[in-house]
Curated annotation (Swiss-Prot):
Ranges in a coiled coil: none
Name this protein carries in UniProt: Ribosomal protein uS12 methylthiotransferase RimO
The species this protein was found in: Pseudomonas paraeruginosa (strain DSM 24068 / PA7)
One Pfam short name: UPF0004
Gene: rimO
Location relative to the cell: Cytoplasm
GO molecular function: 4 iron, 4 sulfur cluster binding; aspartic acid methylthiotransferase activity; metal ion binding; protein methylthiotransferase activity
All copies of domain Radical SAM core, residue ranges: 135-373
Signal peptide start and end residues: none
């Protein structure tokens, strides 16, 4: 008599890079015959992939761990907060195992110890798709090209959690991308901690893909991805000079004209305290140059207000810079101290919470006006949209200017579309975040 199929529940928190880690773990478990179930009650064990970047993320991770313990009782913890095992066990001493980020084998081993795999599992019958298990909709996928980061930003603890930059061989990355495209993926979202540094640790060594030599470097990676016939979107791009190399690829339609560059601030004084590059004037000149080459270029960024030592003058400098930069998509966070971050030792004056809140509100209002004006320029134009979902009100999609979950939507007045469709539309209306359109 065959043994019951072991069942695993999975909760994935945090950024897209953590989501890719979750996909890798789930793919291995499925290859070993485990069934992935969507509810706590159906699972024999639950894995929680945590985020530990800021205090609010840690609080959410602890809350979800507690929920999983209450609903199931057998919980394994992994991910970025796993480097703080004591903090997890102080609150939830009953967790079965705690592992850190990228510790895939340890997570799978911990699952084995709680719920052994089926001894009669036949991997030739229980097939896993060639692209692996994906937690995103079928038509888009995240493509992680490296782990870790070589920067030492004072507000960040990512290097201590995920280590120094380790680039994947370009042949492996391109082979994975090819499998995803063959499986029906229509948009590849390239992610890492520092996409523009890809290959630095390998000294840009030449690898092979489909028998052809390819350098392990951002430009060559993008050239190869751009030949696969799908949308390719770049995230987490540090503004090195080599970013200039990919703008012509965007202008030629090989890559989406979209750059996600986390600037964090504009004041030279604050950037110095953050240990970020302070070339804000040269950055504005580069924006101008990029837009001359590729007029459709969308630039998204994230910023932090209320960093220790930030004055009203620094904040006003940031607002003025935003006016000059005319960014399309922007996120903003109030500074939150992170345990272990170098910023805690700078001895700078903390910004009061009420001042942080006031600056955040002013920042958002300022940028919303910029974003609204830029989106209004699209009214009447025709663009291509990738449909994400369809409901009774119509279809919801995204343009080249919209990454999933963090940017805006394009609401299309049609009931004849389905997720994964690409459709040409005419923009009829806009607000500060979203567009409305009708099929052409």
């Amino acid at each position: 008599m065959s043994t019951p199929t072991p069942k695993v529940g999975f909760v994935s928190l945090g950024c897209p890079k953590a989501l890719v880690d979750s996909e890798r773990i789930l793919t291995q478990l499925r290859m070993e015959g485990y069934e992935v179930v969507p509810t706590y009650e159906d699972a024999d064990v639950v894995v929680v992939n945590t985020c530990g970047f800021i205090d609010s993320a840690k609080a959410e991770s602890l809350e979800v761990i507690g929920e999983a313990i209450a609903e199931n009782g057998k919980v394994i913890v992994t991910g970025c907060m796993g480097v703080e095992e004591h903090a997890i066990r102080d609150v939830h001493p009953s967790v079965l195992a705690v592992t850190g980020p990228q510790q895939y084998e340890q997570v799978v081993t911990a699952v084995h110890e709680v719920v052994p795999p089926k001894t009669e599992h036949n991997p030739l019958i229980d097939l896993v798709p060639p692209q692996g298990i994906k937690l995103t909709p079928r038509h888009y996928a995240y493509l992680k090209i490296s782990e870790g980061c070589n920067h030492s930003c004072s507000f960040c603890i990512i290097p201590s959690m995920r280590g120094k930059l380790v680039s994947r061989p370009v042949g492996d990355v391109l082979s994975e991308a090819e499998r995803l495209v063959k499986a029906g993926v229509k948009e590849l979202l390239v992610i890492s901690q520092d996409t523009s540094a890809y290959g630095v640790d390998l000294k840009y060594k030449t690898d092979f893909w489909n028998g052809q030599p390819v350098k392990t470097r951002m430009k060559e990676l993008c050239e190869a991805l751009g030949g696969m016939g799908v949308w390719v979107r770049l995230h987490y791009v540090y503004p090195y000079p080599n970013v200039d190399d990919v703008i012509p690829l965007m202008a030629a339609g090989k890559l989406l004209p979209y750059l996600d560059i986390p600037f964090q601030h504009a004041s030279p004084k604050v950037l110095k305290a953050m240990k970020r590059p302070a070339f804000e004037d040269k950055t504005l000149a580069r924006f101008k140059h990029w837009r001359e080459i590729c007029p459709e270029l969308t630039i998204r960024s994230t910023f932090i207000v209320g960093f220790p030592g930030e004055t009203e003058e620094d904040f006003q400098y940031l607002l003025d810079w935003l006016t000059e930069a005319q960014l399309d998509r922007v996120g903003c966070f109030q500074y939150s101290p992170v345990e272990g971050a170098p910023a805690n030792e700078l001895g700078l004056e903390p910004v009061p919470d009420e001042v942080k809140q006031d600056r955040w509100e002013r920042f958002m209002a300022h940028q919303q006006a910029i974003s609204a004006a830029r989106l209004q320029l699209k009214v009447g134009k025709e663009i291509e949209v990738l449909i994400d979902e369809v409901d009774e009100q119509g279809a919801v999609g995204r343009s080249w200017a919209d990454a999933p979950e963090i940017d805006g939507n394009v609401f299309v007045d049609s009931d004849a579309l389905k997720p994964g469709d690409k459709v040409r539309v005419r923009i009829t209306d806009a607000d500060e975040y979203d567009l409305w359109a009708e099929p052409v």
